[in-house]
Amino acid sequence: MSAIPEGSNVTVLNKNEKKAREMISKLGLKKIAGINRVTFRKKDNQIFAIDNPEVYRSQGGNYVVFGEAKIDNFSQKLAAAQEKIQSVSKSPEEIQKDMQLAADQAGDESAKPAAAAEEDDEAPVDAGDLSAEDIELVASQANVSKNKAIKALKEHNGDIVNAIMALSK
């Protein structure tokens, strides 16, 4: 016998499963692809789960499922997940402190650019050959000072649309 190469996908079938598959091929059942998990629930809420099953469908709408069935204890999984969430989650007081700290840091960062922008606005800028109407239009559309509007118009060679777009970013 030759060795099975590494990384190959080999499925070993027992005698009964092999016979069942041969009968299915004779019955004309169609294989359904793309099913990752099948679960069956009994009356007492006991759940049987089959991961990566092979599912076949008959013409009448019945299904045949091949795979290893395992008893799925959903309540244990749920309890473990809740325990994990509780160990990771913070108390409301800790969350409030984190939010306050983040707000304080954001407030400090936003105050610095605003102060720098005010300093830029104080220095008068020469309008040159730009019309007062263009400056007013850019300033009002972009919600900026006239000095910023003049600078943007000069950067874009008097192009109103590009100046407004640059200031709106």
Curated annotation (Swiss-Prot):
Domain NAC-A/B per the UniProt entry, residue ranges: 14-78
Organism for this UniProt entry: Vanderwaltozyma polyspora (strain ATCC 22028 / DSM 70294 / BCRC 21397 / CBS 2163 / NBRC 10782 / NRRL Y-8283 / UCD 57-17)
Subunit annotation: Part of the nascent polypeptide-associated complex (NAC), consisting of EGD2 and EGD1. NAC associates with ribosomes via EGD1.
Entry keyword set: Cytoplasm, Nucleus, Protein transport, Transport
Function description: Component of the nascent polypeptide-associated complex (NAC), a dynamic component of the ribosomal exit tunnel, protecting the emerging polypeptides from interaction with other cytoplasmic proteins to ensure appropriate nascent protein targeting. The NAC complex also promotes mitochondrial protein import by enhancing productive ribosome interactions with the outer mitochondrial membrane and blocks the inappropriate interaction of ribosomes translating non-secretory nascent polypeptides with translocation sites in the membrane of the endoplasmic reticulum.
Chief location of this protein within or outside the cell: cytoplasm
GO biological processes: protein transport
Renumbered residue ranges of the record's region Disordered: 85-128
InterPro entries given in the database record: EGD2/NACA0like, NAC-like_UBA, NAC_A/B_dom_sf, Nas_poly-pep-assoc_cplx_dom, UBA-like_sf
Similarity remark: Belongs to the NAC-alpha family.
One Pfam family matching this protein: UBA_HYPK
Ranges where the UBA domain occurs: 130-169
Protein's cellular compartments: Cytoplasm; Nucleus
Single GO cellular component term: nucleus
Database matches in SUPFAM superfamilies: UBA-like (SSF46934)
Name of the featured protein: Nascent polypeptide-associated complex subunit alpha
